[in-house]
Amino acid sequence: MARPVQRFQLWSPLGFLLQLVTLLGKLGPQVQSVRPESLLFVSTLDGSLHALNKQTGDLKWTVKDDPIIQGPMYVTEMAFLSDPADGSLYVLGTQKQQGLMKLPFTIPELVHASPCRSSDGVFYTGRKQDAWFVVDPESGETQMTLTTEGLSTPQLFIGRTQYTVSMHDLRTPALRWNTTYRRYSAPLLNGSPGKYMSHLTSCGMGLLLTVDPGSGIVLWTQDLGVPVTGIYTWHQDGLHQLPHLTLARDTLHFLVLRWGHIRLPASSYQDTATQFSSLDTQLLMTLYVGKEEAGFYVSKALVHAGVALVPRGLTLAPMDGPTTDEVTLQVSGEREGSPSTAVRYPSGSVALPSQWLLIGYHEPPPVLHTTMLRVHPIPGKVSAETRASEDLHAPPVFFELLNLRREDPELHPEEKASDSYPGLGSQDLLAATFTAILLGAWVLYLMRQQQQSPSAPAGPPDLSQDAQGQLSRDILQDQRRFQSPSEPAQPPHDPEAGQPTVVGKISFNPKDVLGRGAGGTFVFRGQFEGRAVAVKRLLRECFGLVRREVQLLQESDRHPNVLRYFCTEHGPQFHYIALELCQASLQEYVESPDLDRWGLEPTTVLQQMMSGLAHLHSLHIVHRDLKPANILMAGPDSQGQGRVVISDFGLCKKLPVGRCSFSLHSGIPGTEGWMAPELLQLPPDSPTSAVDIFSAGCVFYYVLSGGSHPFGESLYRQANILSGDPCLAQLQEETHDKVVALDLVRAMLSLLPQDRPSAGWVLAHPLFWSRAKELQFFQDVSDWLEKEPDQGPLVSALEAGSYKVVREDWHKHISAPLQADLKRFRSYKGTSVRDLLRAMRNKKHHYRELPAEVRQTLGQLPAGFIQYFTQRFPRLLLHTHRAMRTCASESLFLPYYPPALEARRPDATKS
């Protein structure tokens, strides 16, 4: 008995502590398992439920389901739109009131009141269906779906309700309208959750920002790709909804980029429009109308003063739908209308997706008041009219979300524990407490042993000074490693002091900002190995975007008209790309008359831009975001000449070998107002590199017109693009340069992508010919035609439409000295294009033999000579170029036409 007792005394309490550590190690995987309280659940419009880490925003898993809103894909007859956040209903157009209007009930309320009917004889039916599903919090795997037929023991027990509303009209056999709305069973979380974290989303896209409400610093961002409809947390074994604020995409970028953080003011229950006066801007509550694969939807959103709004009651198109005279639904007791009134667009626009006119930010609409739901009042609910009128203002919970004063928030103990230490639950805390007690006992034991043995060393006998120092360093590293992610890493310098930031071979001053982009991207002026560069800083979460952009830059930057890439460096929070430093953008070139242009004429700018684009297309790279802001001006070089480069490869797409199109599964690329129509049309086709040609056509007109857009003002720009209705008034003047430019721009802006020219064809267009090349072309054509019979196909094509080309009789439009000189040698037909070219060729060949008076009239060779004729006959060059296209493969005409593989070109527009 003595030996076992002695063995027990040898390792007590050290042996017991080691046994406990071994036991906890075996339980390690259970301690480290993901707990629901550590996750933030985000629902998106496509029906997916995403689980994010509350502290870092990392995506853990995604459960896919049916879309939140499913309705008509096209707004052709019925114009009912739904808000996926709460199921609110809006109607576009009634008999006497045009524009967007809000109905005083939601889809769930309409289902509760069904069956019911409106005063114009339209019957409403509704159906509600509840379901449960169970999700594994570790993997996101959906184990089963529960109905009333059975129960199971859940891990994450989530309820979802589906509401279906149908509208029937006895006067027509077809179903008038139907929609399906789904929402999670998640009551609003009590307390003030917004004081610890504030969540901001952008409408029309899936960008989610989580902000520290005390400092306004962005803790993390996550792009889910689809608009966010709800944010939830797990609290007391159930899903609870968290408030979030939806802002316009540009407004969200405006707030972040203007102050470097979300600087929103504290406020109470006042009007939203007046809350932001202290910010030198103004945010207004609007209604955003968007479109996803499941159909149109609406969402309340805050916008700043720079965002274009659709006015209240704006008539988008004349209505030719049926009349409903016997309607009792009234607006403010004066105007009458019905939510069942059919909305139709003009017959000329039905084939085109004119419903895109809806998309944008609308002023808050008026409310249609109706007695339809009073037949079946909803118990325990505020009246629909009262709730609808209050809904025009920002909910009070938003103002708590915007409260950014630094206070010591009183959090719920569960919330504070789960948010600060997402991996710890009640069992984990118990184990940690027990371990701490044992460690304390071990320390007391050592102290007692030290008191009993005065000669013992002060510290543990097996740790040297170096070992103790290493242990201290390891502990310090562990503290840094396990620092709360909500506390941003401190930079090694004070940004306000203007000291440079050095990351590898790149250095830059954070205060020297050159530009800002989407997704928190900044561009700084910096240095790379002694060379002045532009440093593009991207968020750490954008690693895939950085890698793709760098790969495309490395592959394409050997061309002088593509932005040059130098290197990439990675920091703890950001990625840094060193790029060629440019002096201005094309937008500044056009809109700033005082800007030094370094000898770059507008046509030279466009030619260099197309040269860079043709290089990208030859590498099977589609840029997908051409616009003036992405075309930069570099230089000047040693001769004082500038250079045009294409930049911003963030949306570029590398086409696989053997493919000429790309899909839109990852979203619609580009910038509104500069995107090709096929990117937005439904059903979507597989776009090709022709999308770049369309965007380039918009840029062409923007440059040649001095800043105008071919599709009008920004509010109606994308709708005009979809209708294929450009306004090229700035190029309508009957001059040589504008006639040639109009021909090219019109071809590049063709509605059908197959009708647009290739990049190689654009570069071969006469718009970019020098005066010497124009003169040589006319001479070569005239020489070639001398061998052709008068009634041959080539001469016939040249003489077709000659009446407009020679302006009835070209003899009448040349000077008297030249007329007299021409009559000295032979006769020329004034109505013949062939004879006009012959006269030009003869006078060019015998220029030195001409009388001084005639030479003075014609001007110097080649520029003055050719301009003498093209100014008098603006259509001559284009007409001749089209007529001679059948000879494009002849060696004499190869310099004037693109290669056969590049000859994609629509039929010539008849002039």
From Swiss-Prot:
What does the record give as cofactor?
Mg(2+)
Where does the record place the Protein kinase domain? 508-768
Describe the PTM.
Autophosphorylated.
Q: Which residues form the active site?
A: D625
Its membrane topology is listed as:
Single-pass type I membrane protein
Keywords, sorted A to Z:
Apoptosis, ATP-binding, Endoplasmic reticulum, Glycoprotein, Hydrolase, Kinase, Magnesium, Membrane, Metal-binding, Multifunctional enzyme, Nucleotide-binding, Phosphoprotein, Serine/threonine-protein kinase, Signal, Transcription, Transcription regulation, Transferase, Transmembrane, Transmembrane helix, Unfolded protein response
InterPro entries the UniProt entry points to: IRE1/2-like (IPR045133), KEN_dom (IPR010513), KEN_sf (IPR038357), Kinase-like_dom_sf (IPR011009), PQQ_b-propeller_rpt (IPR018391), Prot_kinase_dom (IPR000719), Quinoprotein_ADH-like_sf (IPR011047), Ser/Thr_kinase_AS (IPR008271)
What sequence ranges are listed for the domain KEN? 771-899
Q: Please give the residue ranges for the topological domain Lumenal.
A: 35-426
What superkingdom heads the lineage? Eukaryota
Reactions mediated catalytically: L-seryl-[protein] + ATP = O-phospho-L-seryl-[protein] + ADP + H(+); L-threonyl-[protein] + ATP = O-phospho-L-threonyl-[protein] + ADP + H(+)
Where does the UniProt annotation locate this protein? Endoplasmic reticulum membrane
GO terms under cellular component: cytosol; endoplasmic reticulum quality control compartment; IRE1-TRAF2-ASK1 complex
Q: Which residues are noted in the entry as ATP-binding?
A: L514, G515, R516, G517, A518, G519, G520, T521, F522, K536
The transmembrane residues are: 427-447
User: PROSITE patterns, from UniProt?
Assistant: KEN (PS51392), PROTEIN_KINASE_DOM (PS50011), PROTEIN_KINASE_ST (PS00108)
Q: Which residues are glycosylated?
A: N178
Q: How is its activity regulated?
A: The kinase domain is activated by trans-autophosphorylation. Kinase activity is required for activation of the endoribonuclease domain.
Q: Could you say which residues form the signal peptide?
A: 1-33
Instruction: Write out the GO biological process terms.
Output: apoptotic chromosome condensation; intrinsic apoptotic signaling pathway in response to endoplasmic reticulum stress; IRE1-mediated unfolded protein response; mRNA processing; negative regulation of DNA-templated transcription; positive regulation of JUN kinase activity; protein phosphorylation; regulation of DNA-templated transcription
Q: EC no.?
A: 2.7.11.1, 3.1.26.-
Q: Which residues lie on this side of the membrane: Cytoplasmic?
A: 448-911
Here the disulfide bonds are none
Q: Which PANTHER family did the record assign?
A: IRE1-RELATED (PTHR13954), SERINE_THREONINE-PROTEIN KINASE_ENDORIBONUCLEASE IRE2 (PTHR13954:SF15)
Biological role: Role in expression of the DDIT3 transcription factor, required for the unfolded-protein response, growth arrest and apoptosis. Has no effect on 28S ribosomal RNA cleavage, unlike the corresponding human protein.
Supply the name of the protein.
Serine/threonine-protein kinase/endoribonuclease IRE2
**Organism, per UniProt?**
Mus musculus (Mouse)
Q: Which gene encodes it?
A: Ern2
